[in-house]
Each structure stands twice: as C-alpha cells, then as structure tokens.
C-alpha cells in the first residue's frame, strides 16, 4: 500500500513538471511565431511558473524538507477541481459556438475588426473578411457593418481597412457601414447596434471561430436579440492560446480584449 501511495505521489508531481514544460514550450513557440507582445501569450509563462512552483513544493514535501497542512492540501484540490470544471464547461460553450452555421438572408452582418499593421490587414482579419465577402455575394440584400477603431501602430481605422478590402473584392461600398470608434469586442457591439434600426433583426456576427460564443453573448448584452455566428478560420499556431484566452475572458465579457 505504501508503495502504491509513493508511486501515485511520484506520478502526480511528474504531471506538474510536464504541465510546466508544456506551458513554457508553448510560450516560446508563440513568442517566436508572433512576437512577445502578441495577445495574451504571457499567460503561458505564468502557467509555467505556477505549475513549476507546485512541482517544487511537492518535491520538497516528498523529501521531508517542508510540510503542507492537510487543510491547505484540501483547499488546493477543491480550487483546482472547481477551476478545471469551470474551464471545461466554458470551453464546451466555445466549441459549440465554433460549429455555428450562418443563416441565409441576415438583415445585417457585423464584421468584428482586429489588429491591422499600418494599413494592412492581418491574416486573422482577412479570414473574417473573406467569410463576410462570400456571404455578401450570396445575400445581396444584407447590410454590412465593419466594426473597429484605430489602435496603436495602426495608420487608419480597422473599419476603413475592412471597407477597402471588401470593396476591392467587388462588394458595393453603399452596402457597408463603418463603425470606427470601438476598441474591443464589447464596444464593437455597443456602437454597431446604433446602426441597427430594429434590435430583433437577424444579425450575423463574423469573427474567428473561437470568438463566436463570447461575441454573441456581448451582442445580447448590447441589445441584439436575434444573432447567428459566422465563424472564420483561426491561426493554427495561436489557436490554443486564443481558446484559453476567450475562456478566461468569458467570465468577465466586457474587458479590453484586443479583438
């Protein structure tokens, strides 16, 4: 029995080390791929430190150097179990949003902006715009709202860059409304709803797949009662980062999120 307990203990502290190394490795991959200033990747460095500290405490405890009180151990297990359960539940909502199917003949679609570099759209934004262009061609009576202000390092508003891209793809500029004040997803919805005459209108939300669920939640908070998701492909390298990021932001759906 003692050997089983010892093996179980050894397995558990090895798990913490593996988690720390995975977080550190993914942080290095993201930082190399997108730069250290890329949205939210610092969470992986924090995760590496967090799991590394747990590993260190477990090693010191097994060696008899320190002792962790039983009540603290129970509190830790309860907190971790609660956090893991909440994480799984929210990720299930995000995955459900990713599988959304656009409805035909929307009255409006809102294309959510994200960072541009100078005057140039990024890959993530191009993916969103390509979905919007395809939908606009198939649904010629739909009004398009491109939503995004001007952020740091941007020579123009995201809305204007999106407008130019869609016009270059053959979409009539008279169909496109530019909402150019928003700086985050909450403001995207808050300011875009002002251009929608009837909040019961069918409104499609165009954004990257991981972002659909929270965007529709924010749309409801802004007063839109009838929305559907129009998911665009996400960056494959940063996909896990974005999934975790939106999960954490889901519990507080109105902060500045950079999208």
Describe the predicted segments one by one.
Residues 20, 77-80, 84:
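Residues within membrane-spanning alpha-helices of integral membrane proteins
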Residues 11-60:
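Membrane-embedded alpha-helical segments of integral membrane proteins
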Residues 1-4:
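Short, Lys/Arg-rich, polar N-terminal cytosolic tail immediately upstream
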Residues 23, 27, 83, 87-90:
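Helical transmembrane-bundle signal
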Residues 47-79:
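Cytosolic-side transmembrane helix boundary signature
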Residues 250-259:
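Single conserved hydrophobic/aromatic residue that forms the stacking wall/gate
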Residues 6-13, 17, 40, 66, ...:
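Membrane-water interface of alpha-helical transmembrane segments
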Residues 82, 89-244:
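A structural signal for short, hydrophobic/glycine-enriched beta-strand patches
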């Amino acid at each position: 029995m003692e050997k089983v307990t010892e093996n179980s203990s050894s397995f558990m502290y090895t798990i913490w080390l593996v988690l720390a190394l995975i977080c550190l490795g993914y942080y290095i991959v993201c930082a190399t791929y997108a730069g250290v200033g890329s949205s939210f990747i610092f969470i992986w460095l924090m995760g590496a430190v967090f799991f590394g500290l747990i590993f260190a405490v477990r090693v010191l405890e097994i060696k008899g150097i320190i002792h962790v009180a039983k009540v603290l151990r129970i509190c830790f297990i309860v907190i971790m179990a609660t956090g893991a359960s909440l994480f799984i539940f929210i990720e299930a909502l995000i995955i459900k949003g990713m599988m959304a199917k656009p409805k035909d003949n929307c009255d409006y679609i809102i294309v959510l902006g994200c960072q541009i570099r100078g005057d140039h759209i990024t890959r993530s934004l191009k993916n969103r715009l390509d979905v919007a262009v395809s939908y606009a061609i198939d649904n010629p009576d739909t009004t398009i709202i491109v939503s995004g202000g001007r952020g740091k390092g941007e020579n123009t508003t995201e809305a204007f860059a999106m407008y130019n891209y869609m016009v270059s793809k053959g979409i009539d500029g008279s169909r496109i409304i530019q909402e150019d004040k928003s700086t985050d997803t909450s403001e995207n919805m808050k300011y875009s709803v002002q251009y929608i005459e009837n909040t019961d209108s069918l409104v499609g939300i165009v954004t990257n797949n991981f972002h659909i669920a929270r965007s529709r939640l924010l749309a409801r908070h802004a007063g839109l009662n009838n929305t559907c998701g129009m998911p665009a492909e996400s960056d494959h390298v940063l996909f896990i980062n974005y999934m975790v990021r939106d999960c954490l932001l889901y519990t507080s759906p109105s902060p500045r999120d950079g999208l």
